Amino acid sequence: MFIGVISIFSYKFISKEYKEEINKKYEDEIKNMSKEDLKVVNEVISLAKDREGQEYTWGGKGEIVTKERLKELIDCYGESYYPLDKKDYIGKQGFDCSGLTYWTYKTVTGVNIGYSTIEQQEVLKDYKVDIKDIKPGDLIFTTRHVVMYMGRGKIIHSASRNPYPIGGIKTGSIKYFTTGQVYRPISYINLVKTKK
């Protein structure tokens, strides 16, 4: 009984310190961001978080999946890419990993950052940053996958074809993506908007 009480107090003490450390890290992450950039990035992240729990749809770019669209996708990529019951796709927005990042940035800013992971890396090639300088809204690319950094050591992504919560749109830790390449879409978007 006494050991349990000590464990609870220790956990609360560590949790408070950890929370303070995470909040300090976030303050450092956003320190050099303009208010305008932070506002846009927060809207993008919020839009992605609003989709948390939705299932992964290979080839989905944010469109509502109809029976016809699902048939097109299956004809293009193959039945094995759509392992869930068809009703789990139809009538819902469809997102694969790059579809989520494409759609959120396009919806908030009106700027197309590319559809696929390859296209996004090509479009953003001049905006690569070191992982040590990562900021909210940055995209981390690993082999054929992309995640969005939310800040405070967290990411959001359309993870895999497995049913949610194993797959689908979910949040997680950056620790599994620290070897990826980081790009900053907001810098590209700002350039595009100044040219208009």
Describe the predicted segments one by one.
Residues 1-16:
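Sec-dependent N-terminal signal peptides of Gram-negative exported proteins
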Residues 4, 8, 35-45, 102-172, ...:
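...with weaker cross-activation on analogous glycine-rich loops/strands in unrelated enzymes
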Residues 6, 177, 194-196:
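N-terminal leader/targeting segments
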Residues 13-98, 106-111, 143, 158, ...:
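N-terminal capping segments
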Residues 52-54, 178-181:
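Generic structural motif recognizing short loop/turn segments at the entrances and edges of beta-strands
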